[in-house]
Design a protein with these regions (language model features):
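A conserved mid-protein helix/loop that constitutes part of the nucleotide-sugar donor-binding site
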Residues: 22, 26, 187-201, 276
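Membrane-proximal helix-turn-helix segments that form the acceptor-binding/catalytic region
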Residues: 84-92, 116-136, 229-230
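Donor nucleotide-sugar binding/catalytic pocket of nucleotide-sugar-dependent glycosyltransferases
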Residues: 131-168
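Conserved donor-binding/catalytic core segment of Leloir-type glycosyltransferases
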Residues: 173-190, 196-199, 208-210
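Nucleotide-activated donor-binding/catalytic signature segment of Leloir-type glycosyltransferases, i.e.
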Residues: 223-251
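Acidic donor-binding loop of glycosyltransferase active sites
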Residues: 254-270, 283
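Conserved acidic donor-binding segment of nucleotide-sugar-dependent glycosyltransferases
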Residues: 299, 303-311, 319-325
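A charged, aromatic-enriched C-terminal amphipathic alpha-helix characteristic of glycosyltransferases
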Residues: 324-355
Length: 362
C-alpha cells in the first residue's frame, strides 16, 4: 500500500512489557506508515481501564484492538469487565477489528501458576461469545477453528504469527562459544526447571535466561515461592538470569556467542513471541513438541521439536552445535518464513480485510 488511508484510526494496544503489548508497539510503526493513527495503550489497572473506555466513548473513530485474552490472578475480574465493555461497544460500533492473541480454550490452566478455578473456563467462554460482533484476527489455526466452529463467530481471519522483519539478521556464529538462551517473561508453563539437567548433559554449556517474572503471578499466593525456588535452582546450577533486555541489548548478547534458543514449555498458548523473534535473528530453536510450535514449523519455521525430557533436548542441541549443515538448513527455513509472514505483510492483510469489513470506503 503506497497511499495512506484517509480516515484516522484508533489503535488500542495492550500494555508494553508483555509480549502482546510489545508486538503491538512494533505493529504501530507499520500502521503509521499506512494510516493516520491515534494511539492508546491499556494501563493494567482499574483506573487505566476506566480511562480507556472514556476515550472510546468520546471518539467516533474506527478501532483496531490488540488484546490478550487469558488473564489470571487479580487481573481476571478487570479483564472480564473489559470484555463486557467490548460487547457493549460492539452493539453501537459493530465489526471493529480485534487482534486476539490467545484463548481460554487453548490454555492449559494447570500449569499457569494461578489457582485453577472451575469458573475460569466458564468465564472465558462467556467472554469469547462477547466478541461475536467483531472482526477478529488470530495467529493460531487452532484458535481459528475454535472461534468458527465452537462459538460460531463469522468474521475470523488467520495469519501465521508474524516475524518482526522480512529479512533474517543471521546472528548465529559457528566459531564462537556456544550458548543456550531462553527469552520471555518467566512463568511455570515455560518449563525452565529442566534447564540445569540439560546444561549438565552438554558439558555445562553456558546458559542464560532473559526476562522478568510475570508481575501478576508474583501477586498470587504461590508466586513468590515459585520465584524463590527457581532463582535458587538457577543460581546453584550456574545459570544466569539477566532480567529484561530490549531488542538491541539482546541482539548484542546473541552475537557474542554461538547461540541456540531453548524453549522447554510444559504448555503453550497460541503462538510464541519468543520463538518467532529468535527466527528473525537467524538462530536455531529447539522447543517442546507442542501444538503452538508445531504450527509454526508446519508454516516453514526452522524449529526442531522434541519430547520434553532433558535427554531429548540435549540430543537435539548437541546435533545443532555439531552440524553446520543443519544450522544452515534451519536458517534458510527462517528466511522463507520471515519473507512470507512478516509483520509488514500482516499489516497489509489486517488493513485490507478491515477496510472491506469495517472501515468502508476511504
Amino acid at each position: 500500500m503506497t497511499e495512506k488511508y484517509k480516515k484516522e484510526i484508533l489503535f488500542v494496544n495492550s500494555f508494553r512489557g508483555s509480549g502482546i503489548g510489545d508486538f503491538g508497539w512494533k505493529l504501530k510503526s507499520e500502521l503509521e506508515a499506512r494510516l493516520q493513527i491515534k494511539y492508546v495503550e491499556i494501563s493494567p489497572s482499574w483506573k487505566g481501564l476506566v480511562r480507556l473506555w472514556k476515550t472510546l466513548t468520546r471518539c467516533n473513530l474506527q478501532v483496531i484492538f490488540n488484546l490478550g485474552f487469558t488473564s489470571f490472578g487479580k487481573s481476571i475480574y478487570r479483564n472480564f469487565f473489559n470484555f463486557m465493555m467490548l460487547k457493549l461497544y460492539s452493539t453501537v460500533h459493530p465489526l471493529q477489528s480485534v487482534i486476539l492473541h490467545d484463548s481460554i480454550d487453548t490454555s492449559n490452566l494447570e500449569y499457569s501458576g494461578y489457582s485453577n478455578s472451575r469458573l475460569l473456563p466458564v468465564g472465558g467462554a462467556i467472554a469469547t461469545i462477547m466478541l461475536k460482533n467483531y472482526n477478529i484476527f488470530v495467529f493460531s489455526k487452532i484458535s481459528y477453528d475454535i472461534l468458527k466452529k465452537k462459538y460460531g463467530i463469522k468474521n475470523v481471519n488467520y495469519f501465521p504469527f508474524p516475524a518482526e522483519n522480512e529479512t533474517v539478521l543471521e546472528c548465529y556464529k559457528q566459531d564462537k562459544e556456544p550458548l543456550l538462551l531462553n527469552m520471555g517473561y518467566i512463568a511455570p508453563y515455560k518449563g525452565l526447571e529442566i534447564l540445569p539437567e540439560i546444561k549438565t548433559k552438554l558439558n555445562n554449556i553456558k546458559t542464560i535466561i532473559v526476562g522478568n517474572f510475570y508481575g501478576s503471578l508474583l501477586s498470587t499466593k504461590n508466586g513468590p515461592k515459585f520465584k524463590q525456588e527457581l532463582v535458587t535452582l538457577m543460581k546453584d546450577s550456574g545459570i544466569k538470569m539477566l532480567g529484561y533486555m530490549d531488542d538491541a541489548r539482546l541482539i548484542e548478547l546473541v552475537k557474542e556467542y554461538r547461540t541456540v534458543a531453548i524453549l522447554p514449555y510444559v504448555s503453550g498458548y497460541n503462538a510464541s513471541y519468543s520463538a518467532i523473534f529468535f527466527l528473525t535473528l537467524g538462530i536455531p530453536v529447539v522447543a517442546t513438541n507442542l501444538d503452538t510450535f508445531l504450527e509454526s514449523r508446519n508454516n516453514g519455521a526452522g524449529i526442531i521439536l522434541v519430547n520434553r525430557t532433558p535427554d531429548a533436548f540435549a540430543a537435539a542441541l548437541d546435533m545443532i552445535l555439531n552440524s553446520s549443515d543443519l544450522t544452515r538448513s534451519l536458517i534458510e527455513d527462517d528466511k522463507k518464513y520471515c519473507a512470507h509472514y512478516s509483520i509488514h505483510n500482516f499489516c497489509d492483510f489486517l488493513i485490507d480485510v478491515s477496510k472491506s469489513v469495517t472501515f468502508g470506503s476511504p
